[in-house]
Design a protein with these regions (language model features):
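N-terminal Sec-pathway targeting helices
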Residues: 2-16
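A structural signal for conserved, well-ordered secondary-structure elements
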Residues: 19-158
Length: 158
């Protein structure tokens, strides 16, 4: 085989491998999302999964996290204007909110998780920022889908 033929064969092999890699990545990225997850709205990046959750308190909407879950929350780069998230169960969007930082001077009328207020490895899903008085709309946190899911996996607290 001549050198030019070897280059053509090598180029075809490289292109095939690249194509297979791209198709594989696309396939895996479109797989249904299983379980509970808090995802960044803009990138669909999973921030917290049920593997990061120790317990979910139905009454206070507090989520006790594993040490790894706390690290993930602390690693978020949340701007003063917040970072939108969506809570999903098995890929179905349940409700939206925003990660927020308690040093922000901006108010927010939606659901928030203040990433700077982690206490005892626990985050809280709250109405409005800086207080519930700023919240507008219907409170989506009392979702039977979330409660049922955590009940089934033994992580729901009353």
């Amino acid at each position: 085989m001549r050198l030019s033929e070897k280059k053509v064969v090598l180029s075809v092999i490289v292109l095939l491998l690249a194509g297979i890699s791209i198709v594989g990545w696309l396939f895996l990225s479109q797989q249904p999302q299983e379980g509970f997850g808090i995802y960044l709205s803009e990138s669909n990046e999973l921030v917290i999964s049920d593997k990061d959750v120790v317990s979910y308190n139905k009454n206070s909407h507090e989520i006790k996290l594993t040490a790894r879950g706390v690290e993930k929350i602390k690693a978020l780069k949340v701007p003063m204007t917040g970072s939108p998230f969506v809570i999903k169960i098995n890929g179905k969007e349940i409700y939206n909110g925003s990660f927020w930082v308690s040093v922000s001077s901006l108010s927010h009328s939606g659901i928030v998780i203040d990433t700077l207020k982690i206490q005892d490895n626990t985050i809280k899903i709250e109405k409005g920022y800086p207080s519930p008085e700023f919240f507008k709309g219907t409170d989506p946190r009392n979702s039977y889908e979330i409660f049922d899911y955590f009940q089934k996996i033994g992580k729901l607290i009353h």
